Amino acid sequence: MRLRLPTLRLPRSRRGRRLAVQGVMALCVLALLPATWMRLGAGDRVGTTADAPAGEVVMVFGAGLWNGRPTPYLAHRLDAAAELYRTGKAKVVLVTGDNSRVEYDEPDAMRTYLTERGVPDDRIVSDYAGFDSWDSCVRAKKIFGVDRAVLVSQGFHIHRATTLCRSAGIDAYGVGVDEPRDATWYYGGARELAASGKAALEALFRPDPHFLGPQEGGVAEALASASR
């Protein structure tokens, strides 16, 4: 027995076809509105490591592990953060990622990668509950007391991250890491369209992160160590 799929039939009248096309266009516009808002929210506060203002904290978002090591995208983010530290544009690196399972620890893998590239261990602070971008931004502000930070992520994500952190109360500047326009990049860009809708709701309603917890003094202690 052959399965017949339903066919999409356009209206026969010219007016009906015009309304159908207008409806599709309206849906496309609505789908793009959150992503457009994210870019406008970031404004001119996104650039390269050379453009980034000097400050105290650089914040790196997790981007997955392969066999316990940072994925290439995460490694590139960490390379940019290490460059900001070496050039004196940051005194402390806040690594924020997922450690919801014992066998999966993004922050510790990020810390190891940075120390292997010359960033002192006492200048690295770990947030083990950065389960998504909004959680990372809110926790940086409320748990770690970060008021101003340079954020590092890929170009397709950095506008959303910057807008969310600004909505969370952080004076944020985003550094976008360039990547080849391969399948992974296009997948990330497409994923951003879906993630932007969720992010717009988060910025509007400002929910608590999945895990808030008590305040931590890691960033303040690392900055004090840097000033000695």
Can you annotate each of these PLM segments?
Residues R2-A52, L212-E216:
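N-terminal membrane-anchoring alpha-helices
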Residues R2-P6, W37-A190:
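A structural signal for short, hydrophobic/glycine-enriched beta-strand patches
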Residues A31-W37, M59, K198-F205:
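Residue-level signal for alpha-helical transmembrane segments in multi-pass membrane proteins
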Residues R101-E106, Y173, A195-E202, V219-A224:
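A general structural signal for short secondary-structure boundary/capping elements
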